[in-house]
Amino acid sequence: MANQRIRIRLKAFDHRLIDQSTAEIVETAKRTGAQVRGPIPLPTRKERFTVLISPHVNKDARDQYEIRTHKRLIDIMDPTDKTVDALMRLDLAAGVDVQISLG
């Protein structure tokens, strides 16, 4: 797999989970002899919701909620077959969305 790149994008609501998962991926890739670029923190997406507390009147009474989506990017340069096998067997946390692309 010479001159190839594996790009891994991670998304999670909890920044501790995503940092733990990126550390596992980087450690696994380095252990198998691949060159790693990252983890690169991408901009955090903040979704804000405003909800009326009162069912009828009192428009001034509101609650605001926020969901933050943290993202990371990891590039693995020149992966070996061993690297790909190790990454496929890697068990990551349940709250982390992983997208892998070959390029």
Swiss-Prot record:
InterPro entries: Ribosomal_uS10, Ribosomal_uS10_CS, Ribosomal_uS10_dom, Ribosomal_uS10_dom_sf. Keywords: Ribonucleoprotein, Ribosomal protein. GO terms for molecular function: structural constituent of ribosome; tRNA binding. One of its GO terms (biological process) is translation. Gene3D superfamilies: Ribosomal protein S10 domain. One of its GO terms (cellular component) is ribonucleoprotein complex. The keyword Iron does not apply. Involved in the binding of tRNA to the ribosomes. Part of the 30S ribosomal subunit. This is Small ribosomal subunit protein uS10.
